[in-house]
Amino acid sequence: MLKQLLSKCAEGKALTEDEAYAAMNIIMSGEATDSQIASLLSMLRLRGETVDELVGFVRAMRDRMTAIEASDDVIDTCGTGGDGAATFNVSTAAAIVISSLGVKVAKHGNRAVSSKSGSADVLERLGIDIHTSPSAAKQALETKGLAFLFAPLYHAAMKHAAGPRKEIGFRTVFNLIGPLANPARCKRQVVGVYSTCYAEKLAEAMRRLGSEHVLFVTGRDGLDECSIAAETDVVELKDGAI
């Protein structure tokens, strides 16, 4: 089936939500070759991912992830990365600061793939154990107000795409859908996005996926952050309206 979906993409056609769901399931089950995964990621990047594709991919990720129970007031600060600016990991610093103010943060993150520093890289350099179990993460969230959810532990099936992602090096759809698949199922987030166009797509995708209040920020200088060197565009999803 994946060959048929690849052929459809090669013709410049977009996948339906169900087709995207099926493609991601094939990847996560280990049935896709590295070449097939790299081909799909490259074609999607060149054409531009649609909202239907994003929703289908995220649904598949959520269905296979190891989730943790969390209260409705938990938030996440996460970015797409891949802006090429080599800035420090702002979302991790922001998570630490706001948790000290009493906000519960389930910080979802990974090591760097298409950027210089991921949140896991930062925390490891600080001497923090990132390989915490779901039960330990849940307890930390309840007692300390901050937990780090290391993506490979909660999205174990994504290991099949790790090699192709690293080899091709550029940002892919995984940069976009990672922030949408928090294991704590956060419905409130601040998401840094490297493109306002994609911020709007992600807002619509998260609306369809049930998020309640999400801010998507994009610096006009290309940062997936609130920029201090240029104006910042903000796309807000709140109570079903964008």
From Swiss-Prot:
Anthranilate 1 binds at residues 79, 110. GO terms for cellular component: cytosol. Pfam families: Glycos_trans_3N (PF02885), Glycos_transf_3 (PF00591). The keyword Lipid metabolism does not apply. GO terms for molecular function: anthranilate phosphoribosyltransferase activity; metal ion binding. 5-phospho-alpha-D-ribose 1-diphosphate binds at residues 79, 82-83, 87, 89-92, 107-115, 119. Its cofactor is Mg(2+). Anthranilate 2 binds at residue 165. It is an enzyme of class 2 (transferase). Keywords: Amino-acid biosynthesis, Aromatic amino acid biosynthesis, Glycosyltransferase, Magnesium, Metal-binding, Transferase, Tryptophan biosynthesis. The keyword Amino-acid biosynthesis applies. Belongs to the anthranilate phosphoribosyltransferase family. Homodimer. This is Anthranilate phosphoribosyltransferase. It comes from Bacillus caldotenax.
